[in-house]
């Protein structure tokens, strides 16, 4: 009972903090300290819950004492708590990164609150175990993210916000339509009972149609092929928000695809999963063309986000234990790596005041620290051992071979090399290029605490790579829980297995 009640804390702590910041919004320093402390505590609580789940069983919290399927239910399993812990960790660093900001009062006053509201939506999406509440949490994210995109009130931000909101609202409508159709088919919203009843149904065509609705809805959220909103939105954000969006927004969509297409729509993998592989291949190609086509380092970073979604969904599409295992590992890894990517890119823009990488020379002497961090980040993105991108890609590689997805496998290898090439191209110009070739650049000094935060992420990437066997115990537990027939139902809601009550 105690552990079940503690499951609400990762959601409750940032929610209460976000509301509390409204009353102390004019005290910028106090607001930052309060929000950073809250997210640090949230990270610790989430990690303790994850450790408990690994040694015991998933935690289920029935709100108001109403047992599933009648009440709202949160479930903390190894998949959700791994992502909650990782997300809370990077949000803590993101809040700390913006500690010394000096923008207009409106931005300083309200930025921390809406970052926390967005975090509430993200964590709620990971923890909720019913269809309608995942829609609600997606809407919380959408509203908070819309405010964050438009907070500076520049023309570029408003233009990017229009594209972002239109596509995400369409995705939300499709998600709500899918929830309604699935409720009509099964008569319930609870994940456990939905999965059980779909497996018992004979009308397979209706299930496939509904699964396609969810696939399109979550693809819009994850930037799986439907990527149009992402590059412009990320390019207009400051470093803090760009890192937040890159780390979390698309990852929630990827999580939803993994959860739904392993647990709920697993019986129709002959149709849905080859389509997932196809979409992942298209997404990898889009990302690869994007990172090669642009010279703006913020847009190159944005297309790196799209490219990584292709890798994750390829693992899911293989419909193998190894592939899904790798997808979950790479998903958690990518939350950390993309935070580091945007921290570094944002810091380089701050130092030089420029975004076109061909104009940047002479950083090797000015900021050698960023050169080291940049190389570690590139190797992690490329999947080079011993860094954190390697283990996940190896298992996705294995899953693709087991399933015979050789085209997807080849594309993953080629686009990984392209991703590394596009970033090494920036590195060679910035750090090894002739500093007398371009115009003279006035370098700004970056605060030491921001370098320290980048150092923490670099260390985290190395630790995740070296601790891969330990992390794979978590991801393997998550994979089997969602893919093994009846295991999720038995572990989370055993009272529903023998019939509805």
Swiss-Prot record:
The chain crosses the membrane at residues 4-24, 33-53, 79-99, 109-129, 131-151, 162-182, 207-227, 245-265, 274-294, 309-329, 334-354, 369-389, 409-429, 452-472. Its main location: membrane. One of its GO terms (biological process) is ATP synthesis coupled electron transport. GO terms for molecular function: antiporter activity; NADH dehydrogenase (ubiquinone) activity. GO terms for cellular component: plasma membrane. It is a multi-pass membrane protein. Keywords: Antiport, Cell membrane, Ion transport, Membrane, Transmembrane, Transmembrane helix, Transport. The keyword Transmembrane applies. Belongs to the CPA3 antiporters (TC 2.A.63) subunit D family. This is Putative antiporter subunit mnhD2. It comes from Staphylococcus saprophyticus subsp. saprophyticus (strain ATCC 15305 / DSM 20229 / NCIMB 8711 / NCTC 7292 / S-41).
